[in-house]
Amino acid sequence: MDQQIYSLQKKVEEHKEELIQLAKTLISYQTPAPPARNTEGIQSWIAGYLNELGFSIDKWDVYPGDPNVVGKLKGTDSADYYSLIINGHVDVAEVKEDEEWKHDPFHPIEKNGLLIGRGASDMKGGMACVLFAVKLIREASIELPGDLILQSVIGEEVGEAGTLECCKRGYHADFAIVADTSDMHIQGQGGVITGWIEIKSSQTFHDGTRRNMIHAGGGTFGASAIEKMAKIIAGLGELERHWSIMKSYPGFKPGTNTINPAVIEGGRHAAFIADECRLWITVHFYPNETHDQVAAEIEDYVNRLSDSDIWLRENRPVFKWGGSSMIEDRGEIFPALEVDPGHPGVLALTASHQKVKRECPIIDVSQSVTDGGWLYDAGIPCVIYGPGDLHNAHSVNEKVSIEQLVEYTKIILDFIISWCSRKKEQ
């Protein structure tokens, strides 16, 4: 088998133009999110590609115009051999009108050993590598004992959980790789959750009554919801500082766990005391925490702060956490993902990496978030491992090294065969 894998890896080199053309084809589909609802074309193409390779296809709309595609290659001995999910998203970062691209971002070019175009690094380059590796395996008539599941999902760029929908649909495996941007480091990640904190007064007052609320002898029990929200914002800053002192995680700089007061909305008219205010926050947390845990910590802190305020005791803050889409309901959740370096899947991926790169892979944490947290949250051991680096993801003239695409294809090819040909440990 090792000799057969080596022969296939040589084919990656010999046919790298086919790999590059495959990446160019994926990039040429204009799938920015926002605006989203534009992935039907690329997903139909991927479904057709996998169907021709013998995969059973499951394609369904998550949103109109945005379908998920899952291809499954049933193993010859699924019960006894390890199964694998490889996951990737086909939406890309938006391209704004004022961005100064040197060429059309959706007509990719090669220059100085780089592939340039929107999504080259994040993460259509990685998707192309996986598809090409699978094509070579199928053309070589290699039968995998374990199941191989490829997930091509939508919505990652805007917090739409295409991957969560795959989990809800019942897709599970012994190990998963998210082929997203990691510069070929094996990575875990912290998590992100957004939330709304709303204060609403039980009464509405005219602007002319403000003096009666804020001066001695005024006799009116009332307050501006905006000013009370300012008190909560200050309190969140105190909690954030407490976290930075008391919490830590290897690979993250102290204070990476943040509470960002991102958007504030409030009041109804300049002639009224603000009777409502809403604060939209973004919370970053560490890999060993859950989004439910940090949300509960924030609620507890804000509620205790409210207990110390006479008006807030009577007009309690209300919390709404997460959401299914930054587009649809202005909310998102990216669960954290913790890597176990001793897991058989991580050890096998390390071995595949070493065979090609002649060095151990770096195992660390991403400074961003991916859909990997949803797989981990569903009980699937998972890592982020893909070509491209975060400095290029979302950037003007986004690019990825062609050499890295070739290397990654060789590694993922070796890993698919090795892992899916390995008997489960009893």
From Swiss-Prot:
Q: Disulfide pairs?
A: none
Q: Which domain of life is it from?
A: Bacteria
| Keywords assigned by UniProt, alphabetized | Cobalt, Coiled coil, Hydrolase, Metal-binding, Thiamine biosynthesis, Zinc
This protein's cofactor list reads: Zn(2+); Co(2+)
- Residues folding into a coiled coil are 1-31
GO MF term (any one): metal ion binding
Catalyzed chemical reaction(s): N-formyl-4-amino-5-aminomethyl-2-methylpyrimidine + H2O = 4-amino-5-aminomethyl-2-methylpyrimidine + formate
| EC number(s) reported in the record | 3.5.1.-
**Family annotation (InterPro entries):** ArgE/DapE, Bact_exopeptidase_dim_dom, Peptidase_M20, Peptidase_M20_dimer, Peptidase_M20A
Task: Please name the pathway.
Answer: Cofactor biosynthesis; thiamine diphosphate biosynthesis
Gene Ontology terms: biological process: thiamine biosynthetic process; thiamine diphosphate biosynthetic process
Residues that coordinate or bind Zn(2+) 2: 122, 157, 394
Q: Which family does it belong to?
A: Belongs to the peptidase M20A family.
So what does this one do? Catalyzes the deformylation of the formylaminopyrimidine N-formyl-4-amino-5-aminomethyl-2-methylpyrimidine (FAMP) to give the corresponding aminopyrimidine.
Official protein name in the record: N-formyl-4-amino-5-aminomethyl-2-methylpyrimidine deformylase
- This chain's source organism reads Bacillus subtilis (strain 168)
